[in-house]
UniProtKB/Swiss-Prot annotation:
It comes from Mediterraneibacter gnavus (strain ATCC 29149 / DSM 114966 / JCM 6515 / VPI C7-9). GO terms for cellular component: cytosol. It catalyses: aceneuramate = aldehydo-N-acetyl-D-mannosamine + pyruvate. Pfam families: DHDPS (PF00701). It is found in: Cytoplasm. Keywords: Carbohydrate metabolism, Cytoplasm, Lyase, Schiff base. This is N-acetylneuraminate lyase. Gene3D superfamilies: Aldolase class I. Homotetramer. Induction: Induced in the presence of 2,7-anhydro-Neu5Ac or alpha2-3-sialyllactose (3'SL). The keyword Nucleotidyltransferase does not apply. Its EC number is 4.1.3.3. Pathway: Amino-sugar metabolism; N-acetylneuraminate degradation; D-fructose 6-phosphate from N-acetylneuraminate: step 1/5. The active site is at Y149 (proton donor), K177 (schiff-base intermediate with substrate).
Length: 315
């Protein structure tokens, strides 16, 4: 693909991506439709907590189970609150290129900082086809940064070094959200790309490991339940206080393990926790994600209390 616009790498503003970026949760009303009020309320919550930005319409946003119109409504309501206050990365990948491009154009029109995309799912495509898919999406938002989302355990395909080399020919590509489990992948991507690109840590349970080995930002699905803890963890890492950082990471992980022990989906647990701890009304999860059952409420309450206890201990 010939790139019509050649943006200078020296003009990139990577600083706005460095820090804690919670993945934004899907917000529904009682009928299961997108709740604009819920979206704006959650955005205000993140502004208040002081996080660096938000990652919208990704896995935590249940994007796989939402329509193109749903995802537009979510992003529009995020931007009503977040513009000028938070870095906004919009995940725009759909099961086909046309819809992905539509969301990319929409996101650029709203003024997001970056768009992101997983690779095509279901069919195992050759790397040149994956590159074509990503570049076609990027071309639909020619003035917007592009983040590659590497999550092989769910997408079924991994970002290889060869594919990463090919994608760096696109001047809009600024880095990788790396959610593969080996921390070594972060080191390899960072070492290959250098200072002109940013690598985001994906797995929340290894926030500390990812940051230490080279990730300068982090995007995670549990940050929203306990942003203060991850902000403190990031602060400790930046200050070289590794013993304290490790204690906070361990505490966060225990909370994650508790949240994952319910019958219902983890995001259903998190939404219930945010209702208890923060008074947020975000609704349930969209089927086929499993909803909470009555027996899960004890787990929800325990996890909510664990977050409160950890905040008292470490903040």
């Amino acid at each position: 693909m010939a790139f019509m616009k050649q943006r200078s790498k020296t003009m990139r503003n990577l600083e706005k991506y460095k820090g804690v970026i919670p993945a934004f949760y899907a917000c529904y009303d009682k009928e299961g439709n997108i709740s604009p009020e819920g979206v704006q309320g959650l955005t205000k919550y993140f502004v208040k907590k002081g996080v660096k930005g938000v990652y919208v319409n990704g896995s935590s946003g249940e994007c796989i189970y939402q329509s193109v119109e749903d995802r537009k409504i979510v992003l529009e309501n995020v931007m009503k609150v977040a513009e000028g206050k938070l870095t906004v990365i919009a995940h725009v990948a759909c099961n086909n290129t046309k819809d992905s491009q539509e969301l990319a154009r929409h996101a650029e029109g709203l003024g997001v900082d970056a768009i992101a995309a997983i690779p095509p799912i279901y069919f195992h495509l050759p790397e040149y086809a994956i590159a074509q898919y990503w570049n076609a999406i990027s071309a639909a938002a020619p003035n917007t940064d592009f983040v590659i989302y590497n999550i092989p355990q769910l997408a079924g395909v991994a970002l290889t070094q060869n594919l990463f080399v090919e994608m760096r020919k696109n001047p809009n590509v600024i880095g990788v959200k790396n959610s593969s489990m080996p921390v070594q992948d972060i080191q390899m991507f960072k070492q290959a790309a250098g200072a002109e690109y940013i690598i985001f840590n994906g797995p929340d349970e290894q926030f500390m490991s990812g940051r230490v080995i080279g990730a300068e930002g982090a995007i995670g699905g549990t940050y929203g339940a306990m942003p203060e803890l991850y902000l403190k963890l990031d602060e400790c890492i930046n200050a070289g206080k590794m013993t304290e950082a490790r204690k906070i990471q361990y505490a966060c992980n225990e909370i994650i393990y508790k949240m994952c022990s319910a019958h219902g989906n983890m995001y259903a647990v998190i939404k219930a926790i945010l209702k208890i701890n923060e008074g947020l009304e975000l609704g349930a999860v969209r089927e086929p994600l499993p909803a909470l059952v009555d027996e899960d409420m004890e787990i929800v309450k325990e996890a909510a209390q664990m977050i409160c206890d950890a905040k008292k201990k470490f903040l």
